[in-house]
C-alpha cells in the first residue's frame, strides 16, 4: 500500500476517534459538608443506572469537586457516601449529548454519629477516613502562642528532625497545604514556624496524587506525603492577624507577625518574623522523646506572602514569594573514631564557622480547565541567593585514643605528651573564606486532553531549567606530620594557600508524552515517553600561593569576602600565580530517554499498578584537570520495574504493598582513571571498571481505625538492598594520617525500617488516652579497608541496630491536660574488623507536662523531663539532664485578644547538644554551642474582622469546641537558643 494512503487512513481514524470522544458526556458537581460549610473531599461518588446498576464511580478531590462518565443519554442516580455522613441519592437526567453539572450537593452528618460524639464529650485524637489520617487539633494542647510545629510534634507517629524535616508514620512530608490549597510550595519550614496553632481545627496527613494522576483520574503511584492544615470554622472569611513581640535575657528575642485576608474565592496570607531563638518549641523536645539538637547560634529573618484563587469553575492559581536571611555562629567539637583494618585512627577537631545568606524564592501554579475534557497546568519558579562563609578549624589525628591522656586532646601539653609517645600522627589548621551567588529558574507546562469519559486521555508535558552560579574561595592549610620525616630528618610540613574562582552554568529541557488507554473495566494501559537534554559547564581557576612560605598570611584577620586583604600582600600580579594543573574545566552533556509502560487497575476495593521503565542515556564528558585532557562518550541503559498494590478493607482500613527497582550509574569523575592529590590528606582515585548499582526497595503500610473506641493503628515496613553498591575502598597511611579513596562496587549494603503505632481512649468519654509508637532500624554498611598499598584489602562490615519506644498517657478535660510520657532508644553498632569498637548506647527520656487554663484568662504550661545517655566513650557525655520549661500567660480585654506571657527555658541549666553518626567508615560524635537557658517576655495581640465587623471571641483555650478555639497566635513557646544579632565581617575568636 502506498505510504500516503497509509498516512491518510491513520489520520482519518484519529479524526474519527476524536469525533466520537467529543460526544462523551460528563456528570460533575461539588460536595459540601453541611455542618462546617466546607468542601468535602474524598467522598465516594457513584453513578448508577435507573435500576441501581453500577455505571461509573470516583472520589471527590480536595476541593470537593467530582466528575463521572455517563456513557449515553438517560436517567441516572447519583449516589454520594462518606464516613459519618448520611448517604445522598440525587436524580440526574443526561440529554442532548451534553455534559451535566449538578451544582453543589450538601451532605449532612449522621445523627447516630452525632449522638456518639456528644456522649464522648472530647473529640477523638485521630480518625481515619479512607487513606487520610485526620488529627483533631483540639485534642492536642500546646502552650499559649504556639505555632503548628509544636502541634505536629505531639501528633502520634510524627517526627520533626534536627534539620526541620517532618515524618508522618515513617514517610517524609514534602508539601504543606492549608485547607487543601498549596502553601509556600517547596518550603515546609515557613508554615511550621509561622502558622499559629490557634487557628487550626484539623491536621490531615495523606498521600497527594501527582499532577498527572489528578487530571487523568488514573493513579500513577507518584504521590507525595502532605500535611494539610484545616482552619477553624469562620476563619476563612474576612481578615485576621496575629502580632507577637518577645524579648529576653542573654540578648534573646523573637518577633513575628501574621495576617490573612479571605474574600470569596481569593485568599492571601503574609508573614514577617525575626528571631535568634530557633523557634523549635519546648526545650525538652516532643512528648516522650528527646529535644532537637541545637546546632549553633542562628539569627533568622523571614518575609513571605502566599496567595490562592479558585473561581470554582475554570481557573485556579497559587503563588508564593518569600525572603530569608540567616546569620549563623557554629562552634563544633568533633571526635571521630575511624574503622581501619587493624589499627586505630582517632581525630579531634574544633571548628568555628560563621555563615550568612540572603535568598528569594518565588513559585506559581496556574491551572485552567476550560471544560471537562481539557486541563492545562503551568508551574514557573525562580530562586536567587547569596551566601558567605568563614571557617577556622584546628585538628589532630592520633593512633591511640587521646582521651586516655586527658579531656582536652588539643591542649599543647597533651599534644607534646602524645608526640613524645609516638601516638600523634598529624596536626593541622585550616582557614576558609567562601562566597556564593546563585540564580536558578524552572518551568513546566502540562496539557491534558481526555479523549473519552472512560479514561482514554493524552498528556503533553514540557519542562526546562536554568542555573547560573558564581563562587569564590580563599583557603589556607598548614599541616604538620609527626611520623613522616622530610629530607633533613625533620617532621614534614605541608601547606596549601589557594584562591579559587568557580563559575558554573547549566540548563536543561525536557518533553514528555503520556497516553492512557482503557483495555477493560477500570483497567488502563499507560504508555509514556520522555526526552531530556542537560548541559553543565564549570570552569574553575585556581591561584596557588603555597610557595610563599609558611605563615605568609598570618597577619590577615579572616572576615567575610576578605580575599582582597590576602591578595594585597602579593608581591607579583595575581595572574602570575595561576596554576593550570590545579584549575579545572569540565563540560557534561546528557541525552536521556525514558520509556515507560504501565498497567493500572483501579477497582472499588483494590488498586494494582505494574510496569517497567527503560532509560537509555548518551553522555559526553570533557575535562581539563591535573594536566590531563579527557574527552569521552558513555552509552548506558537502565531499567526500573515497579509494582504497587493497595487494598481497602473498609473506608478506615487500608493495606499498601510497593516494590521498585532502580539503577544508578557511576559519575563520570568516578570512572576517570585520574589521581587527585590536591588535598594530600584526602586523595581520590578513579575506577574505570565501576558497574552500575541496582537498588531494590520494598514498602508495606497498613492502617486501621475503630470509631467506637476511637482506636487507630498503623504499621509500616521499608526495606532497601543495593546490588553492586558504589562504595569506597580506603587505603590509610598510618605515618601521615592520609587516606586514598577509590570508588568500588560492594555488595552487602541494606537497611530496614519498621514501626507500629497504636492510639486509643481508655474510657468511653475519651478523657483518658494512651499512645505507643515503636520503631526498629537495621543498617548494614560494607566497605573495603587497606592499611597500606602493600597490605591486603580487608572487607569491613558495620551492623547498626536502633530500637526505640515512645509511650504516652494523657488526661484532658475542658480546662486541664496532664501528660506522662517516656521513651527509650537503644543503639548497637558492631564492627567486623575491630570488635573492640563495638558500641552499645542508650538514651532515656521520661517526664510529663501540664497545660492548665483558668476561666479568667490565665494559663499555665510546663514540662519536666529527664534525659539520660549511657554507653559513650567520653565519660562527660554519659549524663543525666533534667530539663524544665515553664510558661505563664494572662489574657486581657474583651474577648481576650491581648496576651502577656513569660516563658522560661531550661530553668535548671542542664541541657547539652550532642549528635552521633555511624557509617561503614567510622563513628563521629559532635557537640555544638548554644544558649539553652533563658527567659522571654512576650506580648501577643490577635485581631479578627469577619463580615465587616471586628470580633474578639471568647478566649477559650485549645480543646474547647467554640467557633474560635485556641489561644491567640504568637511566638512558638519554649524555643531553643538561636543566634546573635546580625554579624558584619566577624573576626575569628581563639579557641
Predicted regions and their residues:
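Short, acidic Ser/Thr/Gly-rich low-complexity loop/linker segments typical of extracellular
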Residues: 50-65
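A short, solvent-exposed loop/turn motif at the edges and junctions
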Residues: 48-54, 75-90
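Periplasmic plug
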Residues: 128, 165-213, 226-231, 266
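Short, acidic, small-residue-rich periplasmic hinge/interaction motif at the N-terminus
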Residues: 32, 46-48, 81-85, 95, ...
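Short, polar/charged loop or turn motifs at beta-strand boundaries
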Residues: 132-154, 167-168, 178-183, 244-249, ...
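Structural motif
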Residues: 30-40
Amino acid at each position: 500500500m502506498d505510504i500516503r494512503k497509509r498516512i491518510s487512513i491513520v489520520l482519518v481514524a484519529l479524526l474519527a476517534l476524536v469525533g466520537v470522544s467529543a460526544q462523551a458526556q460528563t456528570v460533575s458537581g461539588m460536595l459540601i459538608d453541611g455542618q462546617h460549610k466546607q468542601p468535602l473531599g474524598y467522598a465516594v461518588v457513584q453513578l448508577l443506572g435507573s435500576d441501581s446498576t453500577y455505571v461509573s464511580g470516583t472520589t471527590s478531590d480536595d476541593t470537593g469537586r467530582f466528575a463521572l462518565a455517563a456513557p449515553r443519554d438517560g436517567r441516572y442516580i447519583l449516589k454520594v457516601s462518606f464516613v459519618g455522613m448520611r448517604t445522598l441519592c440525587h436524580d440526574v437526567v443526561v440529554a442532548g449529548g451534553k455534559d451535566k453539572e449538578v451544582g453543589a450537593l450538601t451532605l449532612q452528618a449522621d445523627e447516630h454519629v452525632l449522638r456518639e460524639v456528644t456522649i464522648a464529650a472530647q473529640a477523638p485524637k485521630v480518625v481515619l477516613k479512607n487513606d487520610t489520617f485526620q488529627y483533631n487539633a483540639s485534642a492536642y494542647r500546646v502552650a499559649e502562642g504556639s505555632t503548628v510545629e509544636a502541634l505536629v510534634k505531639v501528633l502520634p507517629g510524627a517526627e520533626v528532625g534536627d534539620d526541620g524535616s517532618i515524618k508522618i508514620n515513617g514517610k517524609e512530608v514534602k508539601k504543606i497545604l492549608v485547607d487543601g490549597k498549596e502553601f509556600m510550595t517547596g518550603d515546609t519550614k515557613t508554615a511550621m514556624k509561622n502558622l499559629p496553632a490557634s487557628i487550626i481545627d484539623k491536621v490531615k496527613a495523606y498521600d497527594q496524587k501527582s499532577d498527572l494522576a489528578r487530571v487523568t483520574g488514573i493513579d500513577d503511584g507518584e504521590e507525595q506525603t502532605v500535611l494539610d492544615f484545616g482552619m477553624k470554622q469562620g476563619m476563612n472569611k474576612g481578615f485576621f492577624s496575629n502580632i507577637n513581640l518577645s524579648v529576653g535575657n542573654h540578648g534573646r528575642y523573637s518577633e513575628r507577625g501574621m495576617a490573612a485576608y479571605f474574600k470569596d474565592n481569593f485568599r492571601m496570607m503574609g508573614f514577617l518574623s525575626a528571631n535568634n531563638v530557633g523557634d523549635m518549641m519546648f526545650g525538652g523536645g516532643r512528648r516522650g522523646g528527646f529535644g532537637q539538637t541545637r546546632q549553633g547560634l542562628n539569627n533568622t529573618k523571614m518575609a513571605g506572602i502566599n496567595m490562592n484563587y479558585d473561581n470554582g469553575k475554570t481557573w485556579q492559581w497559587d503563588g508564593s514569594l518569600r525572603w530569608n536571611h540567616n546569620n549563623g555562629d557554629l562552634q563544633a567539637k568533633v571526635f571521630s573514631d575511624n574503622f581501619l583494618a587493624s589499627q586505630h585512627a582517632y581525630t579531634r577537631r574544633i571548628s568555628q564557622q560563621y555563615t550568612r545568606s540572603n535568598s528569594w524564592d518565588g513559585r506559581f501554579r496556574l491551572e485552567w480547565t476550560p471544560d471537562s475534557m481539557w486541563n492545562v497546568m503551568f508551574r514557573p519558579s525562580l530562586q536567587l541567593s547569596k551566601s558567605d562563609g568563614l571557617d577556622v578549624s584546628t585538628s589532630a589525628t592520633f593512633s591511640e585514643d587521646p582521651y586516655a591522656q586527658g579531656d582536652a586532646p588539643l591542649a599543647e601539653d597533651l599534644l607534646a605528651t602524645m608526640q613524645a609517645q609516638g601516638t600523634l600522627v598529624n596536626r593541622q589548621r585550616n582557614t576558609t573564606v567562601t562566597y556564593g551567588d546563585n540564580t536558578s529558574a524552572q518551568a513546566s507546562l502540562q496539557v491534558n486532553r481526555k479523549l473519552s469519559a472512560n479514561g482514554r486521555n493524552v498528556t503533553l508535558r514540557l519542562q526546562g531549567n536554568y542555573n547560573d552560579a558564581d563562587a569564590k574561595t580563599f583557603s589556607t592549610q598548614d599541616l604538620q606530620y609527626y611520623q613522616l620525616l622530610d629530607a633533613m630528618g625533620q617532621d614534614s610540613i605541608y601547606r596549601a594557600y589557594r584562591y579559587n574562582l568557580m563559575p558554573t552554568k547549566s540548563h536543561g529541557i525536557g518533553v514528555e508524552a503520556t497516553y492512557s488507554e482503557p483495555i477493560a473495566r477500570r483497567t488502563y494501559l499507560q504508555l509514556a515517553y520522555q526526552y531530556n537534554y542537560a548541559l553543565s559547564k564549570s570552569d574553575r581557576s585556581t591561584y596557588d600561593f603555597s610557595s610563599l612560605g609558611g605563615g605568609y598570611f598570618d597577619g590577615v584577620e579572616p572576615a567575610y569576602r576578605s580575599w582582597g586583604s590576602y591578595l594585597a600582600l602579593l608581591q607579583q600580579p595575581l595572574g602570575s600565580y595561576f596554576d593550570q594543573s590545579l584549575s579545572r574545566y569540565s563540560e557534561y552533556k546528557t541525552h536521556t530517554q525514558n520509556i515507560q509502560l504501565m498497567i493500572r487497575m483501579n477497582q472499588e476495593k483494590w488498586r494494582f499498578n505494574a510496569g517497567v521503565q527503560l532509560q537509555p542515556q548518551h553522555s559526553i564528558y570533557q575535562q581539563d584537570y591535573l594536566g590531563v585532557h579527557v574527552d569521552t562518550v558513555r552509552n548506558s541503559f537502565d531499567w526500573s520495574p515497579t509494582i504497587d498494590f493497595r487494598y481497602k478493607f473498609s473506608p478506615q482500613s487500608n493495606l499498601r504493598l510497593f516494590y521498585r527497582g532502580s539503577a544508578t550509574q557511576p559519575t563520570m569523575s568516578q570512572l576517570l582513571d585520574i589521581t587527585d592529590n590536591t588535598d594530600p590528606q584526602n586523595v581520590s582515585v578513579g575506577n574505570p571498571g565501576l558497574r552500575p548499582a541496582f537498588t531494590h526497595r520494598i514498602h508495606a503500610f497498613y492502617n486501621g481505625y475503630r470509631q467506637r473506641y476511637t482506636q487507630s493503628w498503623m504499621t509500616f515496613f521499608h526495606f532497601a538492598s543495593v546490588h553492586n553498591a558504589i562504595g569506597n575502598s580506603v587505603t590509610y597511611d598510618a605515618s601521615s594520617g592520609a587516606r586514598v579513596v577509590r570508588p568500588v562496587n560492594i555488595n552487602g549494603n541494606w537497611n530496614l525500617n519498621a514501626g507500629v503505632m497504636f492510639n486509643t481512649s481508655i474510657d468511653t468519654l475519651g478523657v483518658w488516652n494512651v499512645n505507643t509508637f515503636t520503631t526498629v532500624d537495621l543498617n548494614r554498611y560494607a566497605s573495603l579497608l587497606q592499611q597500606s598499598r602493600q597490605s591486603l584489602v580487608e572487607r569491613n562490615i558495620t551492623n547498626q541496630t536502633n530500637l526505640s519506644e515512645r509511650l504516652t498517657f494523657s488526661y484532658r478535660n475542658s480546662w486541664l491536660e496532664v501528660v506522662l510520657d517516656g521513651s527509650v532508644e537503644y543503639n548497637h553498632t558492631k564492627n567486623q574488623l575491630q570488635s573492640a569498637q563495638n558500641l552499645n548506647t542508650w538514651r532515656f527520656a521520661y517526664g510529663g507536662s501540664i497545660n492548665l487554663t483558668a476561666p479568667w484568662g490565665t494559663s499555665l504550661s510546663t514540662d519536666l523531663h529527664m534525659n539520660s545517655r549511657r554507653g559513650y566513650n567520653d565519660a562527660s557525655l554519659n549524663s543525666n539532664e533534667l530539663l524544665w520549661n515553664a510558661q505563664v500567660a494572662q489574657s486581657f480585654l474583651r474577648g481576650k485578644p491581648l496576651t502577656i506571657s513569660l516563658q522560661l527555658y531550661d530553668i535548671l541549666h542542664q541541657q547539652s547538644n550532642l549528635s552521633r553518626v555511624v557509617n561503614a567508615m567510622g563513628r563521629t560524635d559532635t557537640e555544638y554551642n548554644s544558649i539553652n537557658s533563658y527567659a522571654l517576655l512576650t506580648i501577643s495581640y490577635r485581631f479578627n474582622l469577619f463580615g465587616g465587623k471586628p470580633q474578639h471571641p471568647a478566649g477559650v483555650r485549645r480543646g474547647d469546641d467554640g467557633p474560635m478555639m485556641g489561644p491567640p497566635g504568637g511566638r512558638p513557646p519554649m524555643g531553643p537558643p538561636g543566634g546573635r544579632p546580625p554579624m558584619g565581617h566577624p573576626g575569628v575568636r581563639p579557641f
